[in-house]
Swiss-Prot record:
Localization per Swiss-Prot or TrEMBL: Cell inner membrane
Keywords attached to this entry: Cell inner membrane, Cell membrane, Membrane, NAD, Quinone, Translocase, Transmembrane, Transmembrane helix, Transport, Ubiquinone
Name of the protein described by the UniProt record: NADH-quinone oxidoreductase subunit A
Family indicated by similarity: Belongs to the complex I subunit 3 family.
Length: 137
């Protein structure tokens, strides 16, 4: 059991760190509000676009396929993170780690094959319709 004075010294050091961070944030916000410009007007509230007046709404509706690509990127990015951690410790993990990594890669590859089979990765609607017709037969 750790002695109480050393535990308290670590807690106090963390509390001082948090106070320092909060103080630094307050200082930076205060200085920027004091030194920043205070001119208000209609032109200050409009976005700057090369000196041209904005036309239309800036909000665009994107296809759901872009969100699918973003989700696939996140999934396979996390996969790469786990595989990097395994690759760094491959000697320490031994055969058990190799089997675990193989199972992990196999499950993710099966998911990728399934997404491709149902047409989730197709950008063109024709290919998706053809694959779905084949799956229904």
């Amino acid at each position: 059991m750790p002695d109480v004075p050393s535990t308290l010294s670590h807690d106090w050091a963390f509390a001082v760190f948090l106070l320092g961070v909060c103080g630094l944030i307050a200082f930076m916000l205060g200085v920027s509000s004091l030194l920043g410009s205070k001119a208000w007007g209609r032109s200050k509230n409009e976005p700057f676009e090369s000196g041209m007046l904005p036309t239309g709404n800036a909000r665009l509706r994107l296809s759901a396929k872009f969100y699918l690509v973003a989700m696939l990127f996140v999934i396979f990015d996390v996969e790469a993170l786990f595989l990097f951690a395994w690759a760094v410790s491959v000697r320490e993990s031994g055969w058990v780690g190799l089997v675990g990594a193989t199972v992990f890669i196999t499950i993710l590859f099966a998911g990728l094959v399934y997404e491709s089979a149902i047409g989730a990765l197709d950008w063109a609607p024709e290919g998706r319709r053809k694959r779905q017709a084949k799956l229904k037969q």
